[in-house]
């Protein structure tokens, strides 16, 4: 995979937005109060010199983070590779910068490649001993053996070792544009984010002068652009400065008369990164002294920033080469992007950006109760009113589209997938290292990708999975004695697939993280029917994952196959066959069987997969009517744990449905009723999807309301706490599930429409089979659906209890009424 990185281009010019960017402005949110600069250089309270690698407190912990405005008040923009947050202070614009591959850790630390890679325990021989303990009903022995043998020497906290080999996503620093203004006498302040154009703006009036700023990050041009303008000439008095990542060593030098170059390496792993800055002024004076660019009395000012790292992904890493993930010259790339961006100018960059972004974003439109143009109050006020019980259908459709906006901004082809915080992070270290969490969080990030017509945005996930396969083969063999590949609970960008050092197996033992990830490749094929993708990219990964799952199963003497040992992620004991593990295994085996048949491959393997499906332990219903989470009926009816792993077969899987397995669906409903309607933001997002799969629109709507009220920050980011982006994507996916489902082999229209949404439409959804679907309803009932066939396959459509079947032709549209 060739990493795609970006430049940032900052313009401050007079003039209006281009005509294309003004064509649609309906979806946006805004604040009417500026933020302060109290979070400036948040790392260690503005004292980066206090950083040491042994510091026992993570700077990313929310309770110790003085930068609450960044988390809840900033405006996030991005193009998949670069993320930036706009704080919008009047005195000095503060922009936090991220490049998704700026990571500490990996094989290039001072202890070298062997220190990084030689971490897998040879624990496969213990598997039979654990199973013998289960057979003897000695669960304590089985648990002890698992705890002692299925971890690694790699800690999860940066203070626990030097150098910290797992690493963490880290800030690329902050940019400041001082204005010489104050808030005294200021009025009409507005800081806004348009979802229609992916454009952030700041505007205010000061001393009878109107000031405006505009910000966007272009994917096609690899640039971020910022424009300052005012109602009078000569009002741009700006000082640009840059605060670098404090755990790096570099040098700021002049880059021509009007530019700066920061060339640095991270202290932990010697990763090189470069940031170029230039200033172009029209009118006034420009000086370049002391690492700052100063403009006085200008009518227009342009600041250019380009940023990159030396990281390059590797599908087949050399375990003896510490530089196996090094392959880019950031000095060359930043110079190339800088020159091209300068030559285009602001208007062309904006036009390119808008055309590229709108091509994706405008594919889907949602209208709820004719609330399309109700953007009449600040977003924090809207949320406050909603929390008090006010109806706000505009907010509900805005949040839906915000999830799609975030996916476009944080996941585009050519780079890493969206991590725990997408592509936005304001610190050296962060919550859960801002990593790739493989026991739901990374998967949840991509739940809305195909259904909301953003399938291209899922491609980075598949690139990432391919970086996991080769190292994951070593993990599968050494720990579990299986064929194929898998990964564990947490991954980085350097092919890490092993467990971590903790003996807490409830979270650290996650052998089915790999199979869960692999199901996404089949789903992508099922939505797109891209047979070339299935053959050339997906199949070998799916096959390897299915072989891992098949080999992992314990063949008990009674003829039942169980996943021993296994857990229900982050919850409960080590088990001889947790429901979650069996549900994931069913899913990946079903995927592999179907893929094998389509491609006419691997009949011998397919027979093994089909045999496993016949013998795997069935779902069980417990003493209070619940779908059991473990092989024994030990579920606590008062348990309100955030993870609902045992309902994987209901969602995101396809082995539990009110239509095909009503008894299991009823037992799943009992689980959700007892788990409650609260928990973390992402957990409410998951439950929203599960209630939708149960076809209970009113309860799904209740979860959606709770997500907005209790799991959403003022800038619409999801909160765990702290900020985690997965809940945003889970929420968007859940709303889609309320309005359309296609996972059971047919297009199900309005399967969970709530009473609150009496009238509306959604256009551009994608259904499995390569269909595009528009849905219209009024008075709580379907009026019509319009279906475009992308592959000419047979189509089955369901509404309520009625079903229609039809043959289709590729490229033709069909209107369906019931």
PLM-predicted stretches and their roles:
Residues 28-30, 239-241, 421, 460-463, ...:
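Beta-strand segments within the central parallel beta-sheet cores of soluble alpha/beta enzyme folds
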Residues 522-529, 533, 537-538, 545-555, ...:
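Non-catalytic carbohydrate-binding regions of carbohydrate-active enzymes
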Residues 1-23:
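Bacterial Sec-dependent N-terminal signal peptides
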Residues 69, 392, 434-435, 506-510, ...:
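Alpha-helix N-cap/helix-initiation motif
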Residues 22-505, 523, 543-547, 556, ...:
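Aromatic-residue-lined binding/catalytic grooves and analogous aromatic/hydrophobic interfacial grooves
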Residues 544-598:
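Acidic/histidine-rich catalytic neighborhood
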Residues 439-450, 510-522, 580-590, 645-654, ...:
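Well-ordered alpha-helical segments within folded domains of soluble proteins
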Residues 499-515, 519, 527:
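Extracellular/periplasmic, surface-exposed regions of secreted and cell-surface proteins
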């Amino acid at each position: 995979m060739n990493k795609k990185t970006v430049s940032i281009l900052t313009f401050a010019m007079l003039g209006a937005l281009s005509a294309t960017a003004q064509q649609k402005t309906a979806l946006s949110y805004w604040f009417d109060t500026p933020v302060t600069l109290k979070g400036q250089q948040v790392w260690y309270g503005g004292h980066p010199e206090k950083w040491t690698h042994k510091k026992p407190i993570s700077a990313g912990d929310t309770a110790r983070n003085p930068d609450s405005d960044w988390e809840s008040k900033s405006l996030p923009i991005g193009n998949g590779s670069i993320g930036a947050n706009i704080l919008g202070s009047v005195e000095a614009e503060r922009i936090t910068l991220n490049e998704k591959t700026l990571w500490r850790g990996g094989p290039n630390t001072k202890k070298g490649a062997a220190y990084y890679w030689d971490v897998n325990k040879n624990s496969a021989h213990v598997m039979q001993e654990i199973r013998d303990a289960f057979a003897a009903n000695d669960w304590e022995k089985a648990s002890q053996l698992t705890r002692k043998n299925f971890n690694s020497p790699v800690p999860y906290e940066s203070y626990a070792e030097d150098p910290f080999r797992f690493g963490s996503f880290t800030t690329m620093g902050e940019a400041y544009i001082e204005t010489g203004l104050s808030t005294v006498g200021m009025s009409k302040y507005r800081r806004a984010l348009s979802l229609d154009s992916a454009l952030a703006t700041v505007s205010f009036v000061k001393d009878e002068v109107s000031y405006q700023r505009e910000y966007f990050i272009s994917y096609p041009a690899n640039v971020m652009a910022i424009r300052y303008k005012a109602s009078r000439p000569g009002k741009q008095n700006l000082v640009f400065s840059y605060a670098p990542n404090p755990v790096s060593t570099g040098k700021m030098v002049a880059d021509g008369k009007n530019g700066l170059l920061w060339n640095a390496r991270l202290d932990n792993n010697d990763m090189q990164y470069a940031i170029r800055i230039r200033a172009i002024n029209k009118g006034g004076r420009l000086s370049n002294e002391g690492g700052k660019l100063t403009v006085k009395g200008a009518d227009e000012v342009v600041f250019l920033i380009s940023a990159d790292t030396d990281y390059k992904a590797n599908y087949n890493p050399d375990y003896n080469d510490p530089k196996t993930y090094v392959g880019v010259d950031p000095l060359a790339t930043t110079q190339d992007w800088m020159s091209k961006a300068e030559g285009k100018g602001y208007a062309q960059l904006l036009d390119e950006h808008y055309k590229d972004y709108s091509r994706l974003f405008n594919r889907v439109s949602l209208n709820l109760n004719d609330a399309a143009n109700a953007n009449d109050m600040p977003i924090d006020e809207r949320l406050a009113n909603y929390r008090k019980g006010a109806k706000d259908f505009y907010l509900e459709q805005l949040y839906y589209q915000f999830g799609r906006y975030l996916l476009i901004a944080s996941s585009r082809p050519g780079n890493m997938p969206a991590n725990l915080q997408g592509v936005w992070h304001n610190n050296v270290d962060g919550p859960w290292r801002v990593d790739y969490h493989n026991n739901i969080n990374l998967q949840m990030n991509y739940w809305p990708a195909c259904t909301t017509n953003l399938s291209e945005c899922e491609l980075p996930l598949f690139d990432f999975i391919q970086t996991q396969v080769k190292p994951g083969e070593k993990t599968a063999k050494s720990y579990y004695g299986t064929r194929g590949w898998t990964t564990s609970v947490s991954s980085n960008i350097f092919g890490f697939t092993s467990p971590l050092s903790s003996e807490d197996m409830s979270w650290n033992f996650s052998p089915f993280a790999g199979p869960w990830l692999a199901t996404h490749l089949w789903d992508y094929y099922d939505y797109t029917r891209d047979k070339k993708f299935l053959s050339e990219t997906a199949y070998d990964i799916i096959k390897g994952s299915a072989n891992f799952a098949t080999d992992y199963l314990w063949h008990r003497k009674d003829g039942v196959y169980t996943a021993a040992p296994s857990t229900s992620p982050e919850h409960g004991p080590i088990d001889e066959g947790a429901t979650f593990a069996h549900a994931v295994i069913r899913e990946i085996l079903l995927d592999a069987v179907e893929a094998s048949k389509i491609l006419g491959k691997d009949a011998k393997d397919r027979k093994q997969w089909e045999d496993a499906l016949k013998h795997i332990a069935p779902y069980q219903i417990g003493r209070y009517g619940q779908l059991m989470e473990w092989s024994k009926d030990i579920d606590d009816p008062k348990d309100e744990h955030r993870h609902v792993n045992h309902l994987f077969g209901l969602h995101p899987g396809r082995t539990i449905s009110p239509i095909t397995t009503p008894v299991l669906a009823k037992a799943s409903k009992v689980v959700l009723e007892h788990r409650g309607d609260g928990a973390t933001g992402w957990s409410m997002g998951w439950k929203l999807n599960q209630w939708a799969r149960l076809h209970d629109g009113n309860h799904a709507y209740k979860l959606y309301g709770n997500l907005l009220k209790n799991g959403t920050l003022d800038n619409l980011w999801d909160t765990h706490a702290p900020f985690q982006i997965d809940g945003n994507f889970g929420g968007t996916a859940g709303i889609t599930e309320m309005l359309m489902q296609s996972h059971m082999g047919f297009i199900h229209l309005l399967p969970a429409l709530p009473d609150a949404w009496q009238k509306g439409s959604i256009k551009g959804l994608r259904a499995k089979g390569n269909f595009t679907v528009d849905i219209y309803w009024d008075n709580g009932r379907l009026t019509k659906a319009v279906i475009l066939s992308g592959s000419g396959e047979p189509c089955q459509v369901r509404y309520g209890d009625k079903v229609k079947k039809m043959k289709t032709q590729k490229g033709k549209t069909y209107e369906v009424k019931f």
